[in-house]
Amino acid sequence: MKRVTENQGKKTPGVDGEIWNTPHKKATAVHQLRQRGYQAQPLRRVYIRKSNGKQRPLGITTMKDRAMQALYLLALDPIAEVKADPNSYGFRKERATADAIEQCFTVLCRDYAAQWILEGDILSCFDRISHNWLLANVPMDKAILQKWLQAGFMEKSVLYPTAEGAPQGGICSPVLANLTLDGLETKLREKYPKATFALPKSQS
C-alpha cells in the first residue's frame, strides 16, 4: 500500500480512473486486496518520448494491480537476487549504472586488459519475453502471473490482447526481465572465455 500511494505515480490512474488519495480509499483498498477472486485489469497505454526522438509505449496499471504486484515483488526480489548474474546491474537493489562503470574501469585498467569494448542492446526486450517461459520458470502463483501477462491494454478505447512480453511500467516487469536474462553472462563466458563482462540493463 505504501509503495503505490507514495511513489511518483501515485496520481496517475489506470483504466479505471481510480487513485488512492484518501485514508478511506486506502482502507477500502486494503479490504479489497484481501478478498478472493482477484482479476487483473487491462493496462492504459501511453507513450513517452525517448532521447532518440522515438516513442516508447508504457503500460499504466490500476492502483489495485500495482498493489498486488508490489505484494508479490516482496517474495520475488530475494529470489531474483540469488539467481542474478554477478555482473548484472540493471533494476537491482543497491546496484546502479555507476557500479557497472566501476566494473568496466576495474577490468580495463589492468596491464593485460582488453583493447576494445562491445556494447549492445536487446531490441524490444520487455515486449518480446515469452509468456510460456515466464509461466514455466518464474517461482510464483502461476494463475496470478498469467492474469498479469494476459490482461491486455487499452488504447483509444480499444482493448488489445497481449500474447507476449512483460508490460513496461509494471512493478514486477523489471524483475521478470532480469529473471529471463539470468544465465546470459554464463553463456557469453562459454562462447568468449577471455572476455570480462558488465551488464548494465536491457534496453527497450
Please tell me what each predicted stretch does:
Residues 1-27:
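Non-catalytic, polymerase-adjacent accessory regions of viral genome-replication enzymes
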Residues 2-9, 74-90:
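Charged boundary/loop elements
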Residues 15, 74, 120-122:
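Residues immediately flanking
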Residues 32, 36, 86-87, 92, ...:
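Conserved polymerase palm-domain catalytic core
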Residues 42, 46:
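Extended, charge-enriched "interface" segments that sit outside catalytic cores
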Residues 56-59, 115:
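N-terminal core-binding DNA-recognition domain of tyrosine site-specific recombinases/integrases
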Residues 68-76, 176-177:
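Active/ligand-binding-proximal structured segments within catalytic/core domains
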